[in-house]
Swiss-Prot record:
Keywords: ATP-binding, Cell membrane, Glycoprotein, Membrane, Nucleotide-binding, Transmembrane, Transmembrane helix, Transport. PROSITE patterns: ABC_TRANSPORTER_2. Residues 104-357, 796-1038 form the ABC transporter domain. GO terms for molecular function: ABC-type transporter activity; ATP binding; ATP hydrolysis activity. This is ABC-type transporter oblD. Belongs to the ABC transporter superfamily. ABCG family. PDR (TC 3.A.1.205) subfamily. It comes from Aspergillus clavatus (strain ATCC 1007 / CBS 513.65 / DSM 816 / NCTC 3887 / NRRL 1 / QM 1276 / 107). InterPro entries: AAA+_ATPase, ABC2_TM, ABC_trans_N, ABC_transporter-like_ATP-bd, ABCG_dom, ABCG_PDR_1, ABCG_PDR_2, P-loop_NTPase.
Length: 1446
């Protein structure tokens, strides 16, 4: 355990930390010990002090723990497994889905449903093993050998594969209960880091500690103090205390470094207190010291607490391997060794294999799975196993396996299933659980406590990022003000009846649909919540419940601010009871519809699934409120929609609230005007529905009864119905959250374009995780691809580089006077602890930073960097970001075509890509689709592609690589270094950050730049043979000698005190600055600066290149037209290969159009019917919101790839990016317009209105053109909105706000004549004004109108016939009589022609082409505005040259 080392105490910290967490699970304070919860600041037990000693803290916790064992029984969990077989189901047609072939998938699903058998893929075969409580198992094997599947199986996470029913797994006497009752006792920690990005590290870990805090807490502290202390201890142990107030971040939101984020994930899992822990490559991204420290932590936890750990490691330092008790070696899903780590190497040596010098045991064991790496002893060539099956057979025949079976048998006898240990574990869990928690629950806290804790986290998240909430409140208040000003101070007479209905309709919709964007945030956080559920921290429904409560203050504020403005400015019923009822109903509707959106999100597994159906549902809810289609006009087959629609009940109640028991003076009588001045009340009638001859007013109850068939007695009944819906939807939401998980990938299977040769070959049964298997080195013929790689001559140097960034109010120096150079034909390693600034230095040197202040001197051949620098360098980032729909070859060709010099012929660039593919050994999967992690290329293949994309660009200066071996096993890491070696030998200059290099790997670097925390240089110089130059430097300056068997890369981290527990009294930064090596570096930098410009100028002169082509200094290699062409082709390809996106867009357009069309099927041309047809157009436009919600996330994903990788590499310009993304939507939306037109225009029956004038074809074409411009406007408007915003949610909020303004001012809800003068300009600038006017005039002009029975106005003539009595009025005002010869009870219809209705809403068929032209003006404006906004907000400005500091 290296306890004699000076670093021993601290190095145990992490172990102790785990230990501590377990200790606190079961503890009572012993008076003899010191209470670690009540210590002096700065003491050895204070995790926030400099002198914190993990071992001392651990001992103190141990003393507290040993008191009351009944209250805190120790909980351990081992596992034995035998005959363990795991399989998945695959298909021979692993082809890429596209818009054209996705139907074949439907056919295959149908055939599966009818019993066609799928191909079974064996993942794990005949596994046997035993890991007892307190033991550690290391799982070794290359990526795709089944390591992850094995760990997931042990932890009970079997989504996507099947454990054979005859498999035997015994968790110390427990079997079937593990998955549910004891979930959280065995946990699986995945390789990826999933956290709330805007939450701080401190809050993230406090939450985990509090969620598993035991009922009985030692030391006299409460749960909050306990959780805070545990958080501080674990952060101190993992060396992340300094990140406490920094947000965690993710790949796109800047937070802590990648290594620090990995340690946050480890710390969070540790705080879950699980007695059986499965860690899947959890050291990925950690330096060697932290990786070893992690294993030490697990070792101490196992020794003292009896915790069991199963860990897969892809690059295991020898020191880390030595902490494990047992090893499992997997070879393509077969077990080829299981036993003591100390005996594993000898087992294979005895078989006839040789372990090369300085190869670690773990690397040697893993090398057994590769025929290219394993070395056979002379004379054993024919006797050693070669295939996975042969290795497995040799293992099954071995005495070690016989002993293992005997041990498993004894274990199963000792821990019989459902025996006494099951009761012991239940008692132990019960002692920890809150009193209110069920015994059979896997959770520690009670449900109420879980909700409270999630509420606390919700508040922290809101504080960290209130932008969406604030923008929502602001947007809704603006909308309310706008609507209120349109309907300002409505008169209390009959002239405002329609306006009051329209106002209440809009108020209901605004309150009901304002929370639609909640769906987006629910999908974003789903993966995090499911991980916490697997750790048994809380029920997903507890988080759901807390988020409902967390949103209440916002909803209350929103209801008050929006509705007060709306109610009083518009002069709705000025009575206290009516006002409070209005606000109350609006608020209850908001809550109910929030539950509707949330339940929609929880019932579907992805946003793409949910959007089309939720859009149609929303359309249904909006149309069937009772306003756009009054109850009497609802068709029989669809009337039930109103009964299940909560909004319709709210609208009815608000209408009753406004009109009940009120009489409204009549403002317009029929007949009236010249000749009708002195009429009695019986001889004229109010021209409003619900009027009664002889009355000078209209009763409100009569009006709503006649127009809407509403009854006053329903007012409070409806509120009860809305509440019932609210509780029902809330229950659906909470239950679905607990049971329906997000869409997961099923394992890494290579996907090829349909028809590719790889699909025609019979596949071998590979590991499901792997698909096409590891990319083994293929024997090459002839050239290995090096001949085409340009030999470089430029020298890159930097001096006194500093980088400062503002975090909060303080300035923090990330890099501190860093010097160095990279020369052609050299491989330079950049190393340091996690968070030392390695990636930041690469970003600064590669001109990739967008924030912060850079100072110092960065030169190429003694000259400052020019505009072309970024495209002349290659930068392989740590994150493997690629376009998921492209193939490997397409990705490489895209890079080559756009980044290689324009003078290179196209065919030569494509040939060069073929050479790169050979060089990188990617021939097997060159035409495979990249896919997303899990479905497509595996980790190693992605990493090769990342490097390949940069090589394809033919970088003329140098190649930067950030963690090229991160997450890869030792074999693949070696292959990557082989590749770098090839490049180096051909003159490539390479600067590469690296974590966890083995001694053999480290030896392959020529030079090392070594940074300590704070971005300070510790060493820059040659590594030397066997790292001797490096070792001599540190020993000479006071470091301890390097043991012969030690890995120098790990040793030097210990020497400078960079390992979490190590300590040094030497200031290595100052030592370096005072060393002769530093002086020589400064001299050489000055020499390079002085001589290189002269040498390069001489070279240019002698080679007849006195004036280099201007093109080589351009910012982009390819001209703009070539950029646009290539990018456009790629985006079209991507859309074609995204069938889900296209078909969800199709479903949205077709289903919405059909729904509106058939809801208003063949609507008659009555007064209400004409209004319904107008609302048919109005409701069709409401799909606008869903259309832009579909486009925005798609665009954000594209933009992330462009801004994170392609823009910094100067692959193509922002103009090509934004234009191609706008253009690609236009053809698809043109196709959608045809479908939408056909599904809407004909069912609604508008074509019949063109028959009298024989213009059916012309007006049909005109209507399609208007629908077409609507969809083109929608897509360009979506890009206009999202161009500047980071988040689709914020852009969606603003887009919805502007969409509502367009809708409000289009002339439907309030005609131009009814608008206040101030708002006339909005009527004129709203695109929907011209759209609705054009569609309405084309749809209903130049035909006759009639009245329905309840629309006729009835009165008695003064004398004579009705015709004679009304003759003068009809000639002036229009209209017709039902029976002109009647002498009493005249039935008069005020409208005879549809053009009269059109003129009332300021629409005219003569303006159709003007309206069409104006829509194109708006479309073009959107495109220009999107480009301008993107340039203004998101394109980095040209920075000043780097300042030189002395």
């Amino acid at each position: 355990m290296n306890e004699d080392h000076e670093a021993g105490n601290s190095s145990r910290e992490a172990e102790v930390h785990q230990l501590a967490r377990q200790f606190t699970d079961q503890s009572n304070y012993s008076a003899a010990g010191q209470n670690p919860f009540a210590v002096e600041a700065g003491s050895a037990l204070d995790p926030n002090g400099e002198h914190f000693n993990a071992r001392a803290w651990c001992k103190a916790m141990l003393q507290m723990h040993t008191g009351d064992k009944q209250a805190h029984p120790l909980r351990t969990l081992g596992v034995a497994f035998s005959n363990l077989n795991v399989h998945g189901f695959g298909s021979d047609t692993d082809y890429q889905k596209s818009v054209g072939n996705v139907w074949l998938e439907v056919l295959s699903l149908v055939s599966k449903a009818f019993g066609q058998k799928q191909r079974k893929i064996e993942i794990l075969q005949n596994m046997e093993g035993l890991v007892e409580a307190g033991e550690m198992l290391v799982v070794l094997g290359p990526p795709g050998s089944g390591c992850s599947t094995f760990l997931k199986t042990i932890a009970g996470e079997t989504y996507g594969f099947h454990v054979d029913k005859n498999s035997n797994i015994n968790f110390q006497g427990i079997a079937k209960q593990m998955a549910h009752e004891f979930r959280g006792e065995a946990i699986y920690t995945a390789e990826v880091d999933v956290h709330f990005p805007k939450l701080t590290v401190g809050d993230t870990l406090y939450f985990a500690a509090r969620a598993r805090a035991p009922r009985h807490i030692p030391g006299g502290v409460n749960a909050t103090q306990y959780a805070s202390h545990m958080r501080d201890v674990i952060m101190a142990m993992f060396g992340i205390s300094h990140t406490k107030n920094t947000i965690v971040g993710n790949d796109f939101i800047r937070g802590v470094s990648g290594g620090e984020r990995k340690r946050v994930s480890i710390a969070e899992a540790c705080l879950s207190n699980a007695p059986l822990q499965c860690w899947d490559n959890s050291t990925r991204g950690l330096d060697s010291a932290n990786a070893i420290e992690f294993c030490k932590t697990l070792r101490m936890q196992a020794d003292i607490n009896g915790t069991t750990a199963c860990v897969s490691l892809y690059q295991a330092p020898q020191a880390a391997y030595d902490y494990f008790d047992k090893a499992l070696v997997l070879y393509e899903g077969r077990e080829i060794y299981f036993g003591r780590t100390s005996m594993a190497k000898q087992y294979f040596l005895d078989m006839g294999f040789v372990c090369p010098d300085r190869q670690t045991d773990a690397d040697f064991l893993t090398s057994m799975t590769s025929h290219l790496e394993r070395v056979v002893q002379p004379g054993y060539e024919g006797r050693v196993p070669r295939t996975p099956d042969e290795f497995a057979a040799r293992w099954r025949a071995s005495p070690q396996r016989a002993q293992l079976l005997q041990d498993i048998k004894c274990y199963n006898a000792k821990f019989a299933l459902d025996g006494e240990y099951l009761d012991k574990l239940k008692q132990s869990r019960r002692a920890q659980q809150a009193k209110a928690q069920r015994v059979s629950s896997p959770y520690t806290l009670s449900y109420v406590q879980q909700v409270e804790l999630c509420l606390w986290r919700g508040y922290q998240r809101l504080k960290a990022d209130p932008s969406v909430t604030i923008s929502s409140v602001f947007g809704n208040t603006i909308i309310s003000l706008v609507i209120a000003s349109i309907f300002y101070n409505l008169k209390a007479d009959t002239s405002t009846f329609f306006q009051r209905g329209a106002l209440l309709f809009f108020a209901v919709l605004m309150n009901a649909l304002g929370c639609g964007l909640e769906m987006l945030t629910l999908y974003a956080q789903r993966g995090i919540i499911e991980k916490h559920s697997r750790y048994a921290l809380y029920h997903p429904s507890a988080e759901a419940f807390s988020s409902m409560i967390m949103d209440l203050p916002y909803k209350i504020i929103n209801a008050i601010t929006s509705n007060i403005v709306l109610y009083f400015m518009t002069n709705l019923r000025r009575e206290p009871g009516a006002f409070f009822f209005f606000v109350f109903t609006s608020f209850v509707l908001t809550l109910t519809m929030s539950m509707f959106f949330r339940s929609m999100a929880s019932l579907s597994r992805s946003l793409v699934q949910a959007l089309p159906f939720s859009a149609v549902l929303l359309l249904g809810l909006s149309m069937y409120t009772g306003f756009t289609i009054p109850t009497g006009y609802m068709l029989g087959w669809a009337r039930w929609i109103a009964y299940i629609n909560p909004i319709s009940y709210g609208f009815e109640s608000l209408l009753i609230n406004e009109f009940h028991n009120r009489d409204f003076p009549c403002m317009n009588y029929v007949p009236s005007g010249p000749g009708y001045t002195d009429l009695g009340l019986n001889n004229r009638v109010c021209s409003t529905v619900g009027s009664v001859p002889g009355q000078a007013f209209v009763n409100g109850d009569a009006y709503i009864e006649s127009a809407y068939i509403y009854t006053a007695s329903h007012k409070w009944r409806n509120i009860g119905v809305i509440f019932a819906y609210m509780f029902l939807l809330a229950a659906v939401y909470l239950v679905a959250t607990d049971f329906i998980t997000e869409k997961k990938s099923k394992g890494e299977i290579l996907v090829f374009p349909r028809g590719h040769e790889a699909l025609k070959k019979g596949k071998s049964d590979e590991d499901l995780e792997e698909g096409s298997g590891r990319s083994v080195t293929v024997e090459k013929t002839g050239s290995d691809g090096l001949t085409m790689i340009e030999r470089q001559t430029a020298i890159f140097q930097w001096k006194d580089v500093c980088f400062d960034i503002k975090i909060g109010k303080e300035n923090r120096r990330i890099l501190d006077h860093v010097d160095g150079w990279v020369k052609p034909g050299t491989l330079t390693a950049l190393m340091g602890v996690s968070g030392a600034g390695k990636t930041t230095l690469l970003d600064v040197l590669a001109t990739r930073t967008s924030v912060g202040i850079i100072s110092g001197e960065i030169l190429v051949d003694g000259q400052p960097r020019d505009d072309s620098f970024q495209r002349k360098t290659g930068y392989a980032q740590q994150q493997d970001l690629h376009l998921s729909t492209a193939t490997v070859r397409e990705a490489l060709e895209f890079s080559a075509l756009l980044r290689q010099s324009a003078h290179v012929p196209r065919q030569e660039k494509i040939d060069y890509v073929t050479e790169v593919i050979k060089l990188l050994d990617m021939t097997e999967y060159a035409d495979a689709v990249i896919g997303v992690p899990g479905e497509g290329l595996n980790v190693e293949q992605r990493k090769r592609l990342t490097i390949g994309v940069e090589l394809a660009a033919r970088p003329q200066l140098l190649l930067f690589l950030d963690e090229p071996t991160s997450g890869l096993d030792s074999q693949t890491s070696w292959a990557i270094l082989d590749l770098l070696d090839k490049l180096k030998k051909n003159g490539q200059a390479i600067l590469c950050t690296i974590h966890q290099p083995s001694a053999m790997l480290f030896q392959r670097f020529d030079r090392l730049l070594f940074l300590q925390a704070g971005g300070r240089t510790v060493y820059f110089g040659e590594v030397g043979e066997n790292s001797q130059i490096l070792i001599d430097y540190f020993v000479r300056n006071g470091g301890p000698p390097c043991p012969p068997a030690a890995n120098p890369a790990e040793w030097m981290l210990d020497v400078i005190g960079a390992a979490p527990g190590s300590h040094t009294n030497i200031n290595w930064f100052e030592t370096w600055r005072k060393s002769p090596e530093y002086a020589r570096v400064q001299e050489h930098l000055a020499e390079l600066k002085r001589e290189r410009p002269e040498q390069t100028n001489l070279f240019r002169t002698t080679s007849s290149q006195k004036r280099e082509d201007k093109a080589s200094y351009r910012e982009f290699a390819a001209p703009f037209c070539a950029q646009l062409c290539e990018v456009q082709v790629r985006v079209f390809q991507q859309i074609w290969r995204s069938p889900t996106y296209i078909y969800s867009k199709t479903a949205l357009c077709v289903l919405s159009a059909l729904f509106v069309g058939f809801s208003l099927f063949h609507t008659p041309n009555t007064i209400q019917g004409l209004q319904n047809q107008m609302f048919g157009i109005f409701m069709l436009l409401t799909v606008f919101g869903q259309l832009i919600q579909q486009i925005m996330p798609h665009f954000v994903a594209q933009r992330a790839l462009y801004e994170v990788r392609e823009r910094p590499a100067k692959t193509y310009s922002w103009k090509a990016f934004i234009i191609s993304n706008i253009v690609v939507e236009l053809p698809w939306n043109s196709l959608m317009s045809v479908l939408m037109f056909l599904c809407w225009y004909y069912p609604i029956g508008l074509y019949r209105n063109a028959e009298p004038t024989d213009a059916v074809s012309l007006r049909g074409t005109q209507m399609w053109l208007m629908v077409w411009t609507f969809l083109l406007f929608s897509s360009t408007f979506a890009h206009f909105m999202i161009a500047a915003f980071d988040a689709a949610e914020n852009a969606g909020n603003l887009g919805n706000l502007l969409f509502l303004l367009c809708l409000i001012f289009c002339g439907v809800l309030a005609t131009p004549g009814q608008l206040p003068g101030f708002w006339i300009f909005m009527y004129r600038v709203s695109p929907f004004t011209y759209l609705v006017s054009g569609m309405l005039s084309v749809g209903i002009s130049n035909t006759n109108a009639t009245c329905a029975d309840n629309e006729y106005l009835r009165f008695d003539p003064v004398n004579g016939t009705c015709g004679k009595y009304m003759d003068s009025y009809i000639s002036n005002m229009g209209g017709y009589l039902e029976d002109e010869m009647a002498t009493s009870d005249c039935s008069f219809c005020p409208i005879k022609e549809t053009n009269v209705f059109l003129s009332s809403v300021s629409s005219s068929y003569s303006e159709i082409w003007r309206n069409f032209g104006l829509m194109w003006v708006f479309i073009v404006f959107n495109i220009f505005a999107a480009c301008l906004l993107y340039w203004w907000v998101r394109v980095p400005r040209v920075k000043k040259p780097v300042a030189k500091t002395e």
